[in-house]
Amino acid sequence: AGALGESGASLSIVNSLDVLRNRLLLEIARKKAKEGANRNRQILLSL
C-alpha cells in the first residue's frame, strides 16, 4: 500500500507539471498568434 501511495503522489506531481507546461505552451502560442496578426496588419498598412 505504501508503494502505491508514493506512485500516486508522484503521478499527481507529474499531472500538475503537465498542466503547467500545457498552460505555458498555450500562452506562447497565443502570443505568437497575436504578434503574427500585428505583423500582417503592418504589412498590409505599408503596401
UniProtKB/Swiss-Prot annotation:
InterPro entries: Corticotropin-releasing_fac_CS, CRF. The keyword 4Fe-4S does not apply. One of its GO terms (molecular function) is hormone activity. GO terms for cellular component: extracellular region. PROSITE patterns: CRF. Keywords: Hormone, Secreted. Pfam families: CRF. It comes from the Eukaryota. It is found in: Secreted. Belongs to the sauvagine/corticotropin-releasing factor/urotensin I family. Stimulates fluid secretion by the Malpighian tubules. Increases cyclic AMP production in Malpighian tubules. This is Diuretic hormone 2. It comes from Tenebrio molitor. The lineage of its organism: Eukaryota, Metazoa, Ecdysozoa, Arthropoda, Hexapoda.
